[in-house]
From Swiss-Prot:
One of its GO terms (cellular component) is excinuclease repair complex. It comes from the Bacteria. This is UvrABC system protein C. SUPFAM superfamilies: C-terminal UvrC-binding domain of UvrB, GIY-YIG endonuclease, RuvA domain 2-like. Residues 13-99 form the GIY-YIG domain. InterPro entries: GIY-YIG_endonuc (IPR000305), GIY-YIG_endonuc_sf (IPR035901), GIY-YIG_UvrC_Cho (IPR047296), RuvA_2-like (IPR010994), UVR_dom (IPR001943), UVR_dom_sf (IPR036876), UvrABC_protein_C (IPR050066), UvrC (IPR004791). Pfam families: GIY-YIG, UVR, UvrC_RNaseH, UvrC_RNaseH_dom. The gene is uvrC. Keywords: Cytoplasm, DNA damage, DNA excision, DNA repair, Excision nuclease, SOS response. GO terms for biological process: nucleotide-excision repair; SOS response. Interacts with UvrB in an incision complex.
Amino acid sequence: MADLLSSLKNLSSSSGVYQYFDKNRQLLYIGKAKNLKKRIKSYFSVRNNEITPNPRTSLRVQMMVKQIAFLETILVENEQDALILENSLIKQLKPKYNILLRDDKTYPYIYMDFSIDFPIPLITRKILKQPGVKYFGPFTSGAKDILDSLYELLPLVQKKNCIKDKKACMFYQIERCKAPCEDKITKEEYLKIAKECLEMIENKDRLIKELELKMERLSSNLRFEEALIYRDRIAKIQKIAPFTCMDLAKLYDLDIFAFYGGNNKAVLVKMFMRGGKIISSAFEKIHSLNGFDTDEAMKQAIINHYQSHLPLMPEQILLSACSNETLKELQEFISHQYSKKIALSIPKKGDKLALIEIAMKNAQEIFSQEKTSNEDRILEEARSLFNLECVPYRVEIFDTSHHSNSQCVGGMVVYENNAFQKDSYRRYHLKGSNEYDQMSELLTRRALDFAKEPPPNLWVIDGGRAQLNIALEILKSSGSFVEVIAISKEKRDSKAYRSKGGAKDIIHTISHTFKLLPSDKRLQWVQKLRDESHRYAINFHRSTKLKNMKQIALLKEKGIGEASVKKLLDYFGSFEAIEKASDQEKNAVLKKRK
């Protein structure tokens, strides 16, 4: 405590970020302050050189303060910089007592640029600061389905670079385009099609009706497989905004954020209203080991969503709840980011309160559906058996694959909300000369990406104690808190043997080795994770090998033999680099004379 007491006596009054650590130097909490000295001292009560929690703080905070042994601060220029740095560090380091919201992606918009002669609908996540550009969104899902439908229903220019080619393509032949590239349609005639496209984007009911007519025509012509594609697309578009029945007389442009939860779980609902209609919505389930703090969660949700400059900002942002201090901080953050004032408020009456109540009702409904399933029970049991500090709600699983140390690759699969999240899978080309170096490279590259993609609760490594120790060293150097287990495959590893429940794999943790019965659900859960990562890595290895074989065949056609190919690969590192190299460079490597 002497170190902590000394730190408390020498605090700066500047703006900055503070970090609390326990006696083992494990990160407990990250916060920010306009005045570090004032904020940090508010956590503690110091009498006769004895430090105790401030009794005016919440029980959750008092529990954390009792564990604090060290603190560190980072000074910045102003409160806005502190707010952004705090959010970035929380996502990268995942402290024990901070709430981590993962959904920080920028949602896509559909836009049309009417400053060009033949405008087409496109998807963007970035701002195009120029006149004549019309945006629609944001879309939390279904934007691509809308776009595909528009191109199939209307004779639009099908590709961005079509006009430059000055020659009609196959889309003209199949009557999907009017060939403005060959002046077969005037600008004025095409503009009517573009305006019809706008109407379909603005009125999803009309778009769905056109899709239904197309589906019926296909069914009538016995083209059932194509009709099924339209059926599925209609279903996706219908789900885009489950609240579209809401239509306010006032043409509000609003973003709505509502939290519902308690203890260690909560649900965030986001709704986006444009022109008085809810056009899209999304939700996120949040799990926290050490209690749920609405104020902290709301702050992180707003910063995550608005940190990237968005094309269409609302007139007002409605929040279900937060403190006056946080509301003021967020107001200043938004004004600073967008150089204009956009009001943030917690509605107390009228239409806007009704919108918050609808968002809260939906959050409550999603929360109530979170009943304990068999999978949830297995997660709890795994946490207890493997002595994990928190329930592994999000897991990343790693495996490598190679053939005689060639075509070395690695794969990462992600398991969250009791399902594999294939959009989050990642593939890596590796350079390591053995399985340990390859795993080290794979895990290091993932750890270096923590700032962009926050770390999970748990890493599962395909390997033994050696691979486990590699992972622990990498995580220690990254400063992030992620728990790790490893599973080593039994030598007898046939699929038939495993399917009969005969596998006796071993699970390694920091302090124990577990040899569980094949019928143990906790073992089967870890095996399921490992087998998916193995499948993913193997498939990537096969596709890489096939691609390399094709590249070798192409080089052979150019008169370069296998031995020469190996020399070139050793020097340039990849087939892509070989292709880019000049003949002079390749000849120098092969020591050929002109």
